C-alpha cells in the first residue's frame, strides 16, 4: 500500500512539473514581440528563424515609431544589421530608447554593422569594433536569468553547429558601466553579449548571429537561445493587484 502511495505521489509530482513547463512555454508566447527587420538580403532568413522557433511576431514599420504603439510590446527585437539598413529605426532610435526607459525590453537578435554604428543608438553608449568569431570558440556565461528561462542554457548551446561564419560579428571589446557582460569568449575575453538596466526597462546588445544561424540550420539549441533572449524577462508589466489575465501572471504570483 505504501509503495502504491509513493508511486502516485511521484506521478502527481511529474504531472505538476510537466504542466508547469507547458504553461510556462505557452505563457512565454503570450508575450507580444515587435520585430525591427534588418537588411533585405536576410529578410527570408530572419522570417525562417522565427518560423523554426515557432515564435509569432509583428513587424514594426515606419508608422509604428510612436511611444504609445511601442509600449504595446513586451519585447522589441532588432534584426540583422538593422541599425545600418533600416532607415526608420535610425531616424527613430531615440523613441525606441524611450520605450526601454518606460519599462520595455530591447534586444538585438543578430549582429550590427560596426562601420556605421552610432555609439548612442542604445540607452547607454557602446562602442563596436570588427571582431569576428567562428563557433566552438568556448564561452563563459554569467549568472543571469537570460540563461535560466524558459530554457536552461549552458555553454554547449553556444558551441559547434551554428554554421559557417554564423556565430559572432562586430561586437564590443569591453563592457563599460552600466553594461554587464553576459557571454564572454574564453580566448579574447570579449563580451559577446551585454546587458544593462535603463530606467524601468532592460536592454541586451547581442553580437551573436542568432537569426542567421537558426534560419539556415534550424538547430534546436539555437532555437532555445532565441526563446530565452526574447522571453526571459516576462511581460513588460504585471499588475499583481489587478486581474490576473495571463498564464504568465499566474505563474509569477506563485
Regions found by a protein language model. Give the residues of each.
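Short, Gly/Ser/Thr-enriched beta-strand-loop segments that form substrate-interacting elements
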Residues: 174-192
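A short, well-structured beta->alpha microelement
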Residues: 52-69
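Structural recognition of the beta-strand scaffold that forms the well-ordered cores
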Residues: 33-35, 59, 75-79, 105-109, ...
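Alpha-helical scaffolding within the catalytic cores
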Residues: 60-65, 90-94, 188-192
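Extracellular ligand-binding/catalytic regions of CAZymes and related secreted enzymes
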Residues: 5, 26-32, 37, 41-42, ...
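A glycine-rich, often tryptophan-bearing local segment used as a flexible ligand/cofactor-contacting loop or short
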Residues: 46, 82-160, 178, 206, ...
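N-terminal secretory signal peptides that target proteins for export/translocation
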Residues: 1-11
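Bacterial N-terminal signal peptides
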Residues: 12-23
Amino acid at each position: 500500500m505504501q509503495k502504491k502511495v509513493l508511486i502516485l505521489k511521484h506521478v502527481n509530482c511529474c504531472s505538476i512539473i510537466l504542466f508547469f513547463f507547458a504553461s510556462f512555454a505557452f505563457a512565454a508566447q503570450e508575450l507580444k514581440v515587435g520585430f525591427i527587420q534588418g537588411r533585405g538580403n536576410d529578410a527570408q532568413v530572419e522570417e525562417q528563424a522565427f518560423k523554426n522557433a515557432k515564435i509569432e511576431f509583428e513587424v514594426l514599420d515606419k508608422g509604428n515609431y510612436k511611444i504609445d504603439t511601442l509600449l504595446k510590446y513586451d519585447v522589441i527585437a532588432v534584426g540583422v544589421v538593422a541599425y545600418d539598413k533600416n532607415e526608420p529605426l535610425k531616424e527613430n532610435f531615440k523613441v525606441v530608447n524611450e520605450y526601454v526607459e518606460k519599462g520595455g525590453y530591447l534586444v538585438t537578435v543578430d549582429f550590427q554593422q560596426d562601420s556605421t554604428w552610432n555609439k548612442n543608438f542604445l540607452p547607454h553608449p557602446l562602442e563596436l569594433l570588427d571582431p569576428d568569431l567562428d563557433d566552438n570558440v568556448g564561452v563563459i556565461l554569467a549568472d543571469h536569468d537570460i540563461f535560466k528561462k524558459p530554457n536552461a542554457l549552458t555553454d554547449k548551446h553556444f558551441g559547434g553547429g551554428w554554421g559557417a561564419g554564423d556565430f559572432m560579428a562586430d561586437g564590443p571589446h569591453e563592457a563599460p558601466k552600466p553594461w554587464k557582460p553576459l557571454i564572454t569568449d574564453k580566448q579574447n575575453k570579449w563580451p559577446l553579449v551585454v546587458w544593462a538596466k535603463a530606467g524601468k526597462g532592460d536592454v541586451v546588445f547581442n553580437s551573436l548571429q542568432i537569426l542567421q544561424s537558426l534560419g539556415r540550420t534550424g538547430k534546436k539549441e539555437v532555437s532555445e537561445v532565441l526563446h530565452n533572449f526574447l522571453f526571459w524577462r516576462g511581460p513588460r508589466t504585471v499588475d499583481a493587484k489587478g486581474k490576473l489575465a495571463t498564464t504568465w501572471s499566474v505563474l509569477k504570483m506563485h
